Amino acid sequence: MGQKVHPIGIRLGVVKKHNANWYASPKQYSEYLINDIQVREYLRKKLDSAMISKIMIERPTGAAKITIATARPGIVIGKKGEDIERLQKELTKIMGVPAQVNIEEITSPDLDAHLVAEGIASQLERRVMFRRAMKRAVQNSMRSGAKGIKVELSGRLGGAEIARTEWYREGRVPLHTLRADIDYSSVRAETTYGTIGVKVWIFRGEILDGMNSVYNPVKEEQTRAPKRRGRGNGNRRNTDRG
């Protein structure tokens, strides 16, 4: 039976970057990991309406740097930067070191898999027909410039007695091509009939010309001998006399 690998996990170090960049001793590793989870849960709960996609955490010596990718930066920053200053103080308490918060604006929310999945989940919770929510999300993403998109819903769709899985795809979604820039996310929608799982894959184009260009290798010199031209077969006179 075939199994599917995580589309982002298999591309880490190739065309994708880790959401947490830090080094720790074996004794500190679990402490840092739990602390990262606490920070992410706190930010997603506090900034629920800010349309947050990713939270990147870096830990330079004696400090912490948190980058929040959001489609609504104004909600995070607040009036005259008051909200972001308050946020930095709270994160400093949680992490135990001075925390710096940076905001990264998402200019195309329809090309971000997490925001698309959250949008579908919120529509399902408002009792919008699941097929309409799927097709609307697919059309908006393709209109925004996506090369391909796939949406999959699992659960008691439409309040059915038996749970099932339905999916809708448009364009190309090459999961086996490592140079393909594929964004993926899974979100849960809590409906009156139970939990519905929402998965979204978005293909945004290829990043690299070839796999070797990731490591910037030295180009191999041409070792083949140059081709020899013939002895002017094309310049021979036509001596046939008819």
Curated annotation (Swiss-Prot):
Pfam families: KH_2, Ribosomal_S3_C. One of its GO terms (biological process) is translation. One of its GO terms (cellular component) is cytosolic small ribosomal subunit. PROSITE patterns: KH_TYPE_2 (PS50823), RIBOSOMAL_S3 (PS00548). Residues 39-107 form the KH type-2 domain. Keywords: Ribonucleoprotein, Ribosomal protein, RNA-binding, rRNA-binding. GO terms for molecular function: mRNA binding; rRNA binding; structural constituent of ribosome. Residues 218-242 are annotated as: Disordered. InterPro entries: KH_dom (IPR004087), KH_dom-like_a/b (IPR015946), KH_dom_type_2 (IPR004044), KH_sf_prok-type (IPR009019), Ribosomal_S3_C_sf (IPR036419), Ribosomal_uS3_bac-typ (IPR005704), Ribosomal_uS3_C (IPR001351), Ribosomal_uS3_CS (IPR018280). Belongs to the universal ribosomal protein uS3 family. Binds the lower part of the 30S subunit head. Binds mRNA in the 70S ribosome, positioning it for translation. Part of the 30S ribosomal subunit. Forms a tight complex with proteins S10 and S14. This is Small ribosomal subunit protein uS3.
